[in-house]
């Protein structure tokens, strides 16, 4: 049986995906193809490059420290624009280049440069900000046709593909690619499982995060952007998962996109909840 694994987006919650991978490996569940959006693309790409869950966990903590840092120059530009031009003149608070560099460094250690160099079937979605087109970065041949609304690319650096899929609007700057601006894949495809079906997966396990009904009392601009996106993604989720048999919902209590101090806790929850639901998965 060919098994596919789909990892949804969720910022720092992606640490739970790593715990889930650890649990699946311990149960000897072999993953044949994998997809991931946003933080799910970080985990899925590293796993496809044959990094172990333990190695991915350590790298994810490194990512968290780097990408949670706000670019001071961008803050200065933001303040300058608001005061002197009466408008916002930046695309995001973080360029995302640190994420690109770290992923690309790990790829080079495996003698991988572009996503097509990865042997395991891998799919990472991103969205064209200009017209809403879905870009699928894939390790497979470009001639594979998913549908007319998808554009597939396999001749892109894996670090750049992950950076694009993680470019959360307002937080990370869009990625420029051939006169396009690419943003977080979760805007349109937060649970990219159907593509795995088209790859011939007999069984697809999708790991998603339960909707958080509450919101913290003290919120800032970033919190508002993130919460609005979460509401949109959960509405999209109801449409996306129609027809999906194996869904593992991970509970994450009031965790915001960049709450990196919760990485350890989320990893443990992903592991524990996957173990608890193993009877439904097998």
Located regions from the model:
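Patatin-like phospholipase
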Residues: 1-37, 45-282
